[in-house]
């Protein structure tokens, strides 16, 4: 069964690689998040099912299927876009597998039915088997591209070069309605490309967003979303999803998973300290927004241990990192 599932994983991976080749303008300035998800290059995301479901519903809209993620800096808005890509990629492979399984079951039943009814008159035939229907998830063909604003702007020395690059991306999106752009720091589209009387990126995108020729998931902080909302016509093209920092048990469970994930990445074991203890210390000494504050501390601690060629970190190492980050002696 594992080999069968691997077959559909490979087929979906090949489809995504081919998309990168077909849509050269888009792939040269973005990351294919679905492909990264299939390769296991995206970190797992926990307790964001509600936000992912809200985005999925908005992407299915006939008009203005565009989403604006807002929330405090560091609360995990980009991670939600990655969680959506992971969900879609897994959904597609699972559907392909279940659909093929239903087809195999039908073929087996049909062969048995043919053998049983081979010499019977029509009046005595038993009911023929019917293939089990496997409903296709509505978004399982969607592919999310994380657009790099720096790649879009860089190298545009002369008037019209920026517009040409942006139009190339938009044309790629028009060719395949399953393409969704993820734009981090989306409030910048109000000013990017504004020169010599040009309207900027937002003005170029606005008609295509309204006609659903392209689909966009944008992310920005609550404060900076006001910059985007200054253009009321542009803001109306988006449906807002508020992203709140995880708290309580959800934060603890997520912190524990993040700690294990980073320990695996750095090949470091964690001794005499728990994720809950680290989270309490981070909240008390550093503040900030979870999970960004928590990740900063454990990543710096573990990278320091790797630099020193150590195989483990503990309570003392966490305190040392916090002391360095805050400038205070933490006992």
Please place each PLM-identified region on the residue numbering.
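AAA+ P-loop NTPase nucleotide-binding core of proteostasis motors
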Residues: 2-331
